[in-house]
UniProtKB/Swiss-Prot annotation:
Primary subcellular site in the record, as a coarse category: cytoplasm
SUPFAM superfamilies: alpha/beta-Hydrolases
GO cellular component terms given for this protein: cytoplasm; membrane
The encoding gene: bioH
Active site: 82 (nucleophile), 207, 237
HAMAP family for this protein: Carboxylester
Reactions catalysed, as given in the entry: 6-carboxyhexanoyl-[ACP] methyl ester + H2O = 6-carboxyhexanoyl-[ACP] + methanol + H(+)
Listed GO MF terms: pimelyl-[acyl-carrier protein] methyl ester esterase activity
Organism, scientific name: Wigglesworthia glossinidia brevipalpis
Gene3D superfamilies (UniProt xref): alpha/beta hydrolase
Similarity comment: Belongs to the AB hydrolase superfamily. Carboxylesterase BioH family.
Protein name: Pimeloyl-[acyl-carrier protein] methyl ester esterase
Length: 259
């Protein structure tokens, strides 16, 4: 199998491992790399089937968890956005000794709506899966549009996402479909209690994919003393794109507090 590509930028003593979301690749972090690489060593992951790992055909949630955990430096800090946040959460549960911090961005331990749990309606995810097969490009564009509903910078941010998606070789239908299955089926809420490392969760107050009303529920599920939640006003599902400087300031402050 082709070696797993892993981009490293910066030379700080603290290692940050970045995991992107559905449909995109590690270029999604370009806005903040310029800032954070002055302070930390950044490890930028392309998930299997995406970006530079487009030929790496490994789609199971458990295998992706294993690949990233094994490749990560010891005592690094995981940063995961959306689908990447779900993967980062699982890594910190399965490999509790390897990491010293967890930063979750606009993500949920269960993306699908359940009883007493806010999330995406199952029929919407099913519909996306169906449309993906029949109209690949428009379905991806539609998903990007949903991520920025209500934000003032709507058009600029959507354009950035589309540029990242179409700049490199497109992920296959199988890659995107497998990612949607993870979003639809994975539920690790009951395992949050096993996370015993400092955790920061960043949300956008306008996010319709991961609504801020999950915050008090997650607080009860992950009852650990260093568990910080921050809501960025006027931000939606990708706050690091709409508010890069504030986002980096939050991350630097969090790491400084416990490092």
């Amino acid at each position: 199998m082709k070696p797993f590509f892993w981009r490293i930028i910066g030379s700080g003593s603290v290692n940050l491992v970045f995991i992107h979301g559905w449909g995109l690749n590690s270029c999604i972090w370009n806005n903040i790399i310029i800032i954070l690489s002055n302070y930390f060593k950044l490890h930028l992951v392309d998930l299997p089937g995406y970006g530079k790992n487009i030929l790496y055909k490994e789609y199971s949630f458990s295998k992706i968890t294993e690949i990233i955990a094994c490749k990560s430096p010891k005592k690094s800090i995981l940063i995961g956005w959306s689908l990447g946040g779900l993967i980062a959460t699982n890594i910190s549960i399965v490999y509790p000794e390897k990491f010293k911090g967890l930063i979750i961005v606009s993500s949920s331990p269960c993306f699908c709506e359940k009883k007493d749990w806010p999330g995406i309606k199952k029929e919407i995810l099913n519909n996306f899966s169906f449309q993906l097969k029949n109209d690949f490009h428009n379905t991806v564009k539609k998903f990007f549009n949903i991520q920025f509903l209500g934000t003032k910078k709507n058009n600029n941010e959507i354009k950035k996402l589309k540029n990242i998606f179409f700049r490199q070789k497109e992920p296959s239908y199988k890659t995107l479909s497998s990612g949607l299955k993870i979003l639809k089926n994975i539920d690790i809420r009951n395992y949050l209690k096993y996370i015993k490392i400092p955790t920061l969760r960043i949300y956008g107050n306008l996010d319709v994919i991961v609504p801020v009303k999950i915050i008090p529920i997650i607080k009860k599920l992950q009852n650990f003393n260093i568990n910080k939640n921050i809501i960025i006003p006027s931000a939606s599902h990708a706050p690091f794109l709409s508010h890069p400087f504030l986002f980096c300031k939050i991350i630097k402050y969090f790491i400084k507090k416990f490092n």
